[in-house]
Every structure is written in C-alpha cells, then in structure tokens.
C-alpha cells in the first residue's frame, strides 16, 4: 500500500511539473534595462515585456516594438525600427536566453566568434546595483 502511495504521489508530481517555457514567460514579464547605459548616462534604456506578448522599448525612440515571445529557449522580439528619414523598417530579433532570473536577463545575439552577449537588469533593482558614473556627465 505504501509503495502504491509513493508511485501515485510521483505520478501526480510529474503531471503537475511546471513547463520550462511557461516559467521563462512568467519571469521575463517586467522592465529590463542595460546596466552599462545606466552607468554611463544615468538613463534607463531597454525593454518592457508585458503579459500577452506585448513589448515596448524603454527610452529608445528609434524602436517601435510590438510583440515578444519565447520559443525553444529563444527570445523573439518584433516591431519596427524608425530611421532618421522617417522610414519604418521591420525589426525582428531572435536571441538565445543564456540566463533569466528575477534580477538578470542575459541573451546571446551571436554564438560564434566573436560571441555577442547582451546583459539587462530588472529595472526594479538596477538603481540599487549600478552606480552612475557622475564624471562622464560633467
């Protein structure tokens, strides 16, 4: 009887196991900003990922972002880039999610040499963790 109970409990746990993609989608909701831009300029620039796949650029006037999704560990962002001459160009990215937790989003834009990685911090904690370089503002 005890053995059957353990098997039943194990099956229940497997049935209720979380979907890794859904977990990533929950974690990414929020505002993510580039710490290096904040450190050098004091400006928060990055992305706002909202429920339902809505995406907006934060303080980046040249981007008119529309949607985001996660597919097989990749972050996909779609929208338009706005050129200086007023033209709109399709903007689409597909970047591998290297690290995603409550504070940090790290995506790999280019795997081969040179490897290109972008780091973003959650906007809620960036001011606590990154000091603005006041010398560059003078």
Annotate the PLM regions.
Residues 16-138:
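Lipid interaction determinants
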Residues 4-14:
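Sec-dependent N-terminal signal peptides
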């Amino acid at each position: 009887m005890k053995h059957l109970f353990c098997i039943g409990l194990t099956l229940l746990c497997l049935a209720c196991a979380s979907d890794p993609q859904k977990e990533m989608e929950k974690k990414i909701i929020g505002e993510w900003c580039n710490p290096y831009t904040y450190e050098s300029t004091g400006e928060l620039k990055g992305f706002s990922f909202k429920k339902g796949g809505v995406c907006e650029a934060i303080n980046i006037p040249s981007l008119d972002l529309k949607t985001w999704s996660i597919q097989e560990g990749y972050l996909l962002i779609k929208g338009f880039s706005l050129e200086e001459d007023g033209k709109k160009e399709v903007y689409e990215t597909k970047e591998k999610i290297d690290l995603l937790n409550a504070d940090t989003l790290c995506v790999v834009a280019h795997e081969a040499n040179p490897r290109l990685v972008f780091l973003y911090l959650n906007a809620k904690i960036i001011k606590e963790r990154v000091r603005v370089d006041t010398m560059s503002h003078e």
